[in-house]
């Protein structure tokens, strides 16, 4: 399916429901593109994916959506000026419907691999007609009905009522029969005009059969039994052996999609017919062109699947069927379909075989003259399309990188609000129930006095990298890190009723992770952290312009910080509010140890508790509760890490210089000692590294 139809569906959704709904439809359907190139082929099922996704998002019935989208098709075509072709397709509405197949043939110049539907009319009267619609695609009936209603109003100011008569499925085709009820004022006007002609003048206009077959060199005359009675002089030169044979065994009917029978042809005489020889035209040993026929019933579908190169081996004719009452036969008046002169030469045809009175000679010569120009233009257009696709891919990649940076600075839900044009003030929100965790490293200042600045950076980098991995799976969000302080919240920006439980699970894992870190250069013997937790209400929002940050405001932040300051090494100190919240939601989940009250401010005290242990399995947060700083909606290659590092150049970045300096000195470096542990040793030291020490807290949290 070409992008013209897909782009029409996308345009309708955007104009009817808005960009936000279109974004939801893309997400539900798994589509990533915003625009669709008109002449590019897409998956056959993509249109149905978009329609069903729109149904899921908006709740509108699928049939109603298809009808409304079809109704907007004529307006959509005005962007590409295809509406100008529709205006001249027929003088009346029935003529327009009969000319739709011809329109699709015209569109093959723009869409060479087009698989169009077929339309033909019968039982026309003053009150309407019966329309047959055949297509290899299913599910577009309401789409076509919407097109018919809209075009009848736009071009012919006629109201049409569509009555569905029958639906059949045969040979991978969907055959729909509809009765179109409308006021057909032009019915029989043309026949009346012909009957008013002077009969005496018509009697004087006579023509012999020899002249007739000379004027139409590729005519085929066959009787009711489908046997070929005579052929034109041009066809006689290349297919002399077909006279007396059945036309439906000598040729295959490509268009329209009907059975190759006398009755069917009589019903569809207003349609363009395309025939293709059932066997290829070949040359004998003497170089004389001969035609071989067999009685093998070859499927027409095989010809439809053939490529242009394979079809050139067969003779294709396109024309119209006329019933000759005097001969009691049907005349097929057509011309060969030749894409270029070499094909005509291989078929044994020459320019003088074509009629003088029509433009067939001019078309063949003009096609050759324009072939080089068209090929050049097509090559240039193809190159432009490739460049556009490459630019679009680069744009998408840069957009993903920008999103990745944004999601590292702000929560994904808040960042998406800002991207959609909302102000920073509009992103501010009050959260009545959140739980905040503060941690810091015990005697961090004393540690820094024995380490170089680069060692301090590497030390914090390893610790916080492991902490970041923990929070991604615990339904919490890292607000900020200042020095050795690490602040985490649960319940904002994504609300959850298990915020206290998620925070305590995360804090417990922090202690276990810190206890597994040792140092081998005798500067740091062990790493202890302390943690403080408090629950309450906060106001959250984005602060700053040049460097926007997601910040929390309120007394809850202050109290949580006080909990951390009054905690003990490798301990989690929680406030009475958090303690009560855990006990109310899930009694006995955690074992607590009561501690003395601590002063908060202005002689205000609060009861505190140490977390001793946990009982039962950990609760797994839902994906929507995990506000990661990474955008995991897109998968990218490793080279996307260039987003956070300077481009490769002759000058080294400060980060790479610092890492090299550490390697040369052979000082502090951290590597995992187990699935979650850290081992520190000197890479350049000749001493064998000691076994890592288990520095889990003495009263471990299980």
Curated annotation (Swiss-Prot):
Give the Polar residues compositional bias ranges. 683-695
Q: Which GO terms describe its biological process?
A: nitric oxide-cGMP-mediated signaling; response to oxygen levels
Residues involved in heme binding: 104
Q: Where is the Guanylate cyclase domain?
A: 435-564
Q: Which GO terms describe its cellular component?
A: guanylate cyclase complex, soluble
Chain segments annotated as transmembrane = none
Q: Which residues form a coiled coil?
A: 368-406
Q: Origin organism of this chain?
A: Caenorhabditis elegans
Q: How is the cofactor bound?
A: Binds 1 or 2 heme groups per heterodimer.
State what inhibits or activates this protein.
May be regulated by molecular oxygen. Probably not activated by nitric oxide (NO).
Listed PROSITE patterns: GUANYLATE_CYCLASE_1, GUANYLATE_CYCLASE_2
Q: Which GO terms describe its molecular function?
A: GTP binding; guanylate cyclase activity; heme binding; metal ion binding; nitric oxide binding; oxygen sensor activity
Misc note: There are two types of guanylate cyclases: soluble forms and membrane-associated receptor forms.
Fill in the subunit field for this protein. Answer: Heterodimer; with other soluble guanylate cyclases.
This one is known as Soluble guanylate cyclase gcy-31
Q: Which cofactor does it need?
A: heme
**What is this protein's function?**
Synthesizes cyclic GMP (cGMP) from GTP. May play a role in embryogenesis.
Q: What is its EC number?
A: 4.6.1.2
Disordered, as annotated region:
614-702
* Calcium listed as a keyword: no
Question: Which tissues is this protein detected in according to the database?
Answer: Expressed in a pair of bilaterally symmetric neurons in the head.
InterPro entries per the UniProt record, alphabetical: A/G_cyclase, A/G_cyclase_CS, H-NOX_domain_sf, Heme_NO-bd, HNOB_dom_associated, HNOB_dom_associated_sf, NO_sig/Golgi_transp_ligand-bd, Nucleotide_cyclase
Q: Cite the entry's keywords alphabetically.
A: cGMP biosynthesis, Coiled coil, Cytoplasm, GTP-binding, Heme, Iron, Lyase, Magnesium, Metal-binding, Nucleotide-binding
């Amino acid at each position: 399916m070409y992008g013209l139809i897909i782009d029409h569906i996308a345009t309708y959704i955007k104009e009817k429901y808005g960009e936000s709904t279109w974004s939801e439809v893309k997400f539900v359907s798994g589509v990533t593109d915003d625009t669709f190139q008109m002449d590019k082929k897409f998956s056959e099922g993509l249109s149905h994916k978009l329609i069903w996704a729109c149904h899921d998002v908006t709740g509108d019935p699928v049939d109603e959506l298809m009808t409304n989208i079809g109704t907007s098709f004529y307006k959509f075509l005005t962007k590409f000026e295809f509406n100008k072709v529709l205006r001249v397709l027929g003088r009346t509405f029935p003529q327009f419907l009969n000319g739709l197949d011809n329109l699709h043939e015209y569109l093959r110049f723009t869409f060479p691999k087009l698989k169009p539907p077929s339309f033909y009319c019968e039982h026309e009267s003053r009150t309407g007609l019966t329309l047959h619609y055949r297509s290899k695609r299913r599910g577009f009936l309401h789409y076509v009905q919407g097109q018919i209603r809209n075009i009848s109003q736009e071009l012919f100011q006629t109201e049409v009522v569509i009555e569905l008569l029958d639906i059949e499925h045969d040979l991978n085709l969907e055959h729909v029969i509809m009765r179109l009820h409308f006021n057909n004022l032009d019915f029989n006007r043309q026949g009346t005009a012909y009957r008013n002609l002077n009969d005496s003048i018509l009697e004087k206009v006579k023509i012999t059969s020899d002249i007739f077959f000379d004027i139409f060199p590729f005519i085929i005359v066959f009787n009711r039994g489908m046997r070929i009675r005579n052929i034109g002089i041009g066809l006689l030169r290349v297919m002399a052996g077909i006279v007396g044979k059945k036309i439906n065994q000598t040729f295959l009917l490509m268009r329209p999609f009907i059975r190759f029978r006398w009755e069917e042809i009589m019903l569809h005489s207003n349609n363009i017919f395309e025939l293709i020889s059932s066997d290829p035209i070949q040359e004998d040993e003497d170089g004389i062109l001969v035609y071989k026929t067999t009685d093998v019933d070859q499927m027409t579908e095989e010809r439809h699947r053939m490529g242009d190169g394979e079809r050139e081996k067969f003779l294709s004719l396109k024309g119209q069927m006329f019933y000759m009452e005097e001969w009691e036969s049907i005349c097929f008046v057509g011309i060969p379909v030749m894409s270029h002169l070499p094909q005509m030469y291989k078929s044994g045809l020459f320019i003088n075989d074509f009629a003088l009175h029509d433009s067939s000679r001019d078309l063949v010569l003009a096609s050759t003259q324009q072939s080089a120009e068209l090929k050049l233009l097509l090559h240039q257009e193809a190159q432009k399309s490739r460049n556009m696709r490459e630019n679009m891919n680069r744009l998408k990649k840069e957009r993903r990188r920008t999103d990745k940076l944004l999601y590292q600075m702000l929560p994904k839900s808040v960042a998406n609000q800002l991207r959609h044009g909302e102000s920073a003030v509009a992103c501010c929100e009050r959260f009545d129930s959140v739980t905040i965790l503060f941690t810091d490293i015990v005697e961090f200042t004393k540690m820094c006095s024995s380490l170089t600045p680069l060692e301090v950076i590497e030390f914090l980098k390893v610790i916080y990298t492991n902490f970041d991995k923990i929070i991604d799976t615990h339904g919490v969000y890292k607000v900020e890190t200042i020095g050795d302080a690490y602040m985490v919240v649960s319940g904002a920006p994504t609300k959850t009723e298990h915020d206290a439980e998620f925070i305590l699970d995360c804090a417990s894992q922090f202690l276990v992770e810190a206890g597994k870190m040792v140092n081998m250069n005798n500067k740091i013997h062990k790493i202890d952290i302390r943690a403080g937790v408090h629950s309450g209400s906060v106001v959250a929002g984005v602060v700053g312009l040049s460097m926007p940050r997601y910040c929390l405001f309120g007394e809850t932040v202050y109290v949580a910080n006080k909990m951390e300051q009054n905690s003990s090494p490798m301990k989690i100190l929680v406030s009475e509010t958090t303690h009560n919240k855990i006990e109310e939601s899930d009694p006995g989940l955690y074992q607590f140890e009561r501690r003395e009250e601590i002063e908060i401010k202005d002689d205000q005290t609060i009861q505190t508790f140490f977390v001793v242990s946990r009982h039962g399995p950990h609760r797994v947060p839902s994906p929507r509760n995990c506000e990661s700083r990474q955008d995991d909606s897109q998968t990218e290659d490793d080279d996307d890490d260039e987003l956070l590092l300077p481009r490769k150049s002759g000058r080294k970045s400060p980060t790479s210089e610092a890492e090299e300096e550490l390697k040369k000195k052979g000082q502090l470096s951290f590597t995992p000692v187990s699935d979650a542990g850290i081992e520190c040793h000197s890479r350049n030291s000749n001493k064998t590294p000691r076994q890592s020490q288990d520095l889990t807290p003495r009263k471990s949290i299980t």
